[in-house]
């Protein structure tokens, strides 16, 4: 869901970026029917989506990695510690980005992202509030999927105005 929402918001702003999703579980699973229906109601077709598992090489090649939960961020940091400066939990990323302000395209994206991540410490992951997490809707009601879609769309819309 987040992949399709972010791609749409970036395209609306004329931003060319490669957006891909990957998870901690083994790949190969299609999007759930509830996710397909929720996104279709918002004009997005994710019916061809197939999950894939994240790998150290994917993390290494990514300019930005966004997780839904702090636990995912912890696990990815363990998987590829060198990618830590480019990995953020979504709410934390949006909040920090709003504090720094929009990325000036005349500067390298990596410089802006370093400013966004300034003063972050990995030890925060152990004490950070879980209330920042975006809950996984799998197995939940259609209403839960819709709430998750709205939360993600709000966060990703805000992020798209900054990158």
Regions inferred by a protein language model and the residue ranges of each:
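Acidic side chains
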Residues: 45, 63, 132-136
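Phosphate-binding/catalytic loops
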Residues: 77-163
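Short secondary-structure boundary segments
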Residues: 69-70, 91
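Conserved active-site segments centered on acidic
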Residues: 1-62, 70-85, 157, 161-162
């Amino acid at each position: 869901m987040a992949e399709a929402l972010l791609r749409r918001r970036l395209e609306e702003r004329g931003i060319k970026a490669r957006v891909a999703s990957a998870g901690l579980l083994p790949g190969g699973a299609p999007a759930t029917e509830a996710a397909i229906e929720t996104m279709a109601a918002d004009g997005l077709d994710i019916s061809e989506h197939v999950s894939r598992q994240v790998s150290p090489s994917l993390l290494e090649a990514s300019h930005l990695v966004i997780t839904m939960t702090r636990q995912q961020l912890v696990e990815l940091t363990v998987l590829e510690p060198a990618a830590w400066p480019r990995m953020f939990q979504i709410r934390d990323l949006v909040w920090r980005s709003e504090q720094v302000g929009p990325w000036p395209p005349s500067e390298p994206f990596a410089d802006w992202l370093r400013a966004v991540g300034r003063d972050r410490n990995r030890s925060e992951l152990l004490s950070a509030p879980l209330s920042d997490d975006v809950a996984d809707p799998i197995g939940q009601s259609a209403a839960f999927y819709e709430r998750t879609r709205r939360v993600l769309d709000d966060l990703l819309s805000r992020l798209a105005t900054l990158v």
